[in-house]
Swiss-Prot record:
It comes from Burkholderia orbicola (strain MC0-3). Its EC number is 1.2.1.71. GO terms for molecular function: succinylglutamate-semialdehyde dehydrogenase activity. Pathway: Amino-acid degradation; L-arginine degradation via AST pathway; L-glutamate and succinate from L-arginine: step 4/5. Belongs to the aldehyde dehydrogenase family. AstD subfamily. NCBIfam families: arg_catab_astD, PRK09457.1. It comes from the Bacteria. This is N-succinylglutamate 5-semialdehyde dehydrogenase.
Length: 487
């Protein structure tokens, strides 16, 4: 089983065998040997050797290969979407949009590099001031399972454009998607060693994160793991660290004329991708009184009709399975803990089969829970909080250590102006789902949601460092000398 990609060749790992499973059927989706510490060392060494040649390539030459990658992704959209659906449980309709986003990332990343970094010149009296950007060197990219193609791609593409070389460690829950993606890079003509793939579980990740020859680490995943990485690199200022983590995101419902539109956007916010987006709404603030009652009744009615099915079902479901049977069980357990603390289930979550990742979209009223835990439950578990005043809703929405996304559904533009001034989050939407984001804008949050904006348009900032120069084409003695100098 040759499932590692090192120095331009597919090779076998020397670590333990592990497998990924289709969470909708429990069938094995991928199996192979993991990368040992020695394998990781070979991958980093390969990336280090390749760096000089890759970074010396003309920018347009690097971009030509990356554009070829995008074209091949489009050609292979169905095959890669199937790989994504098989390993993650994500319905095919949604997996196809992920592949399209991967291809679109290339053009956006080239534009971002030129705008955010690139080269700038300004004339001076005796020469020119030049700002250039240099690649860091070897960067490690850690990918998540919820978007195993798109999210690591969002770091790999800008890193390569800038001239870095990459060692990619995907989620152990989606190694097959990583393999399919790297095969496309190989066919696109990427030189040997520029991109290396190390498959594995926790030990592989530790070996890569601890390697002394990496110059940067780009991580997308849980806040707990990201916080550990932040502590680990706290004494190493020479490492560029990009952390894109989770959120306990609020969606505030104001009075609206079109209740069905509000319910639709709430369902998209809470349950899209089976709630496995870091920008999904976890806490939904609903006003007390008659309007709030009508909204909640309609939200419950539509949610109760949502079905979950296997990724390639016909007709396609709105939701697939969550990533694993274990993840499904953890969500049901989280609901139980909330109920023990005083939450009232409106639609209770159940796990369809203990071997599978199927859970239903659930709604629990946590208004009466004192000291509501500030936790991200990564799945379709919506927590309802009834509020008396708009300012009370904003105050409670801000009562979190996270700050990734937030949203307001309201007809009142003055309410929106007040909301965006006072809410604390990196992505703040009005009359759009909380998980609506543009790749042409920076992506990231405040607090425990990450460090600055490591994804989307501002990813370019993490992929190259500025080098300032003052230059003159001719060496000349100044016409005016400093006091005390005699020539």
């Amino acid at each position: 089983m040759t499932e590692l990609f090192i120095d331009g060749a597919w090779v076998a790992g020397s670590g333990p065998v592990f497998a990924s499973r289709n969470p909708g059927t429990d069938e094995i989706a991928w199996q192979g040997e993991s990368a040992s510490a020695a394998d990781v060392d070979r991958a980093v060494a390969s990336a280090r050797r390749a760096f000089a040649g890759w970074s010396a390539l003309d920018f347009e030459a690097r971009c030509a290969i990356v554009k070829r990658f995008a074209a091949l992704l489009t050609e292979r959209k169905e095959a890669i979407a199937t790989a994504i659906g098989r390993e993650t449980g994500k319905p095919l309709w949604e997996a196809r949009t992920e592949v399209a986003s991967m291809a679109a990332k290339v053009g956006i990343s080239i534009q971002a590099y030129q705008e955010r970094t690139g080269e700038k010149r300004q004339d001076m009296a005796d020469g020119v001031a030049v700002l250039r950007h240099r690649p860091h060197g070897v960067v490690a990219v850690f990918g998540p399972y919820n978007f195993p193609g798109h999210l690591p791609n969002g770091h790999i593409v800008p890193a390569l454009i800038a001239g870095n070389t990459v060692v990619f460690k995907p989620s152990e829950l989606a190694p097959g998607v990583a393999r399919a993606t790297v095969e496309v890079w190989q066919e696109a003509g990427l030189p040997a060693g520029v991109l290396n793939l190390v498959q594995g579980e926790k030990d592989t990740g530790i070996a890569l994160a601890n390697h002394r020859q990496i110059d940067g680490l780009f991580f997308t995943g849980s806040s707990d793991t990201g916080t550990l990485l932040h502590k680990q690199f706290g004494g190493r200022p020479e490492i560029v660290l990009a952390l894109e983590m989770g959120g306990n995101n609020p969606l505030v419902i104001g009075e609206v004329e079109d209740i069905d539109a509000a319910v639709h956007h709430t369902i998209q916010s809470a349950f899209l991708s089976a709630g496995q987006r870091c920008t999904c709404a976890r806490r939904i603030f609903v006003p007390q009184g008659a309007f709030g009652d009508r909204f909640l009744a309609r939200f419950v009615d539509v949610t109760s009709k949502i079905t979950a099915d296997v990724f390639d079902a016909d007709p396609q479901p709105f939701m697939g399975a969550v990533i694993s049977a274990r993840a499904a069980a953890k969500l049901v357990d989280a609901q139980s803990r909330l109920i023990e603390q005083g939450a009232k289930p409106i639609i209770a979550m159940t796990q369809r089969d203990p071997r599978l990742g199927f859970v239903n979209a659930a709604i629990v009223d946590v208004t009466g829970v004192a000291n509501l835990p500030d936790e991200e439950h990564f799945g379709p578990l919506a927590q309802i909080v009834r509020y008396a005043t708009f300012d009370d809703a904003i105050e409670r929405a801000n009562d979190t250590a996270f700050g990734l996304s937030a949203g307001l559904l309201a007809d009142d533009e003055n309410a929106w102006a007040h909301f965006r001034r006072t809410i604390r989050a990196g992505i703040v939407n009005w009359n759009r789902p909380t998980n609506g984001a543009s790749s042409a804008a920076p992506f990231g949050g405040t607090g425990r949601s990450g460090n600055h904006r490591p994804s989307a348009y501002y990813a370019a900032d993490y992929c190259a460092y500025p080098m300032a120069s003052v230059e003159s084409t001719q060496l000349t003695l100044p016409a005016s000398l400093s006091p005390g100098l005699h020539f």
